[in-house]
């Protein structure tokens, strides 16, 4: 076992796997934001290139650019928030999987943790941004499908 760890080919393979994983993360985090809509207090963008479908569920990164500064539960000011939502296409529900505020617009500046513990599934009201995301992407052939 110890000789395998120091085998140059094994080390090269391990490095390539790590570089590939880092590259995939960087690619998804550098995908362009596409404007999706507007709310009374924010402009909403999605990262279309990183939408994933797993069965009846979608994972979508959403960016909110707030018109006014907001305050986090830890009393830190932020101007934008990036949230990974999971959407249930059958039951029209959403759940936050990850959420960060940023001091500047478009997810720039210092990152502030906004995710609550054990975020609940939320029923999406008609005409909400979440419902529009389901309508736009649940039936879309553009979404990346993963079979698990």
Residue ranges of model-derived segments:
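N-terminal secretory-pathway/extracellular module detecting exported/lumenal segments
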Residues: 23-148
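Bacterial N-terminal signal peptides
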Residues: 10-20
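Bacterial N-terminal signal peptides that target proteins for export
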Residues: 1-11
């Amino acid at each position: 076992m110890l000789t395998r760890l120091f085998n140059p080919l094994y080390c090269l393979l391990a490095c390539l796997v790590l570089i590939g994983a880092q590259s995939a993360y960087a690619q998804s985090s550098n995908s362009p934001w596409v404007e999706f809509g507007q709310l009374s207090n924010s402009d909403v963008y999605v990262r279309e290139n990183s939408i994933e479908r797993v069965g009846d569920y979608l994972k979508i990164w959403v960016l909110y650019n707030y018109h006014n500064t907001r305050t986090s539960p830890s009393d830190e000011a932020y101007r934008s928030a990036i949230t990974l939502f999971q959407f249930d296409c059958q039951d029209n529900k959403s759940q936050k999987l990850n959420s960060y505020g940023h001091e500047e617009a478009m997810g720039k500046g210092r990152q502030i943790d906004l995710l609550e513990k054990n975020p609940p599934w939320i029923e999406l009201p008609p005409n909400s941004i979440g419902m529009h995301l389901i309508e736009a992407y649940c039936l879309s052939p553009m979404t990346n499908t993963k079979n698990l």
